[in-house]
Design a protein with these regions (language model features):
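Parallel beta-helix/beta-solenoid repeats that form elongated, surface-exposed shafts/blades used
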Residues: 1-13
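Exposed extracellular interaction/assembly regions and N-terminal maturation sites
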Residues: 12-88, 102-105, 112-132
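Extracellular beta-sheet repeat scaffolds used for adhesion and glycan interaction
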Residues: 88-94
Length: 132
């Protein structure tokens, strides 16, 4: 059967999916603003078309251990992406967003630490690029 839960729900103990069970997290669109502050309390996966110079700010409502993906589509070849200091990449090298028209990049992340107001302090991230 189907179990539907709405509202804030907490599960304690171990959750195990068996047999042919699958889990999926809803993808949320990001509005085309200059400084993008993702609300990790409403989604784990996000999508946006990058149309101008954007900065990925410190996410709000983050939880330690939270993981997800941010799908980034290059709108016209001129969009750029900068990052708040909480975003940390392998070797300290900030990736450059793809510039080809309609290029799709994916930024995968895990929240390592948060501040007392639940904004992210340290996010480890890796970008894979140029999906077709």
């Amino acid at each position: 059967g189907t179990i539907r839960v709405s509202g804030n729900t907490s599960l304690e103990g171990q959750l195990q999916l068996t047999e042919s069970a699958a889990a999926a997290v809803h993808t949320t669109a990001i509005n085309g603003v200059t400084s993008v502050s993702l609300n990790f309390g409403i989604a784990q996966n996000f999508f946006t078309s990058v149309t101008a110079a954007h900065t990925l700010a410190r996410p709000t409502n983050a939880r330690v251990g939270q993981v997800g993906s941010i799908l980034l589509m290059q709108d016209g070849g001129s969009g750029t992406l900068a990052y708040n200091a909480c975003w940390n990449f392998i070797g300290g090298e900030t990736p450059t967003f793809s510039t080809a028209n309609d290029a799709m990049d994916r930024l995968d992340y895990i929240v390592v630490s948060i501040s007392t107001d639940n904004t992210a302090e340290n996010i480890q991230a890796v970008m894979t690029q140029a999906y077709s």
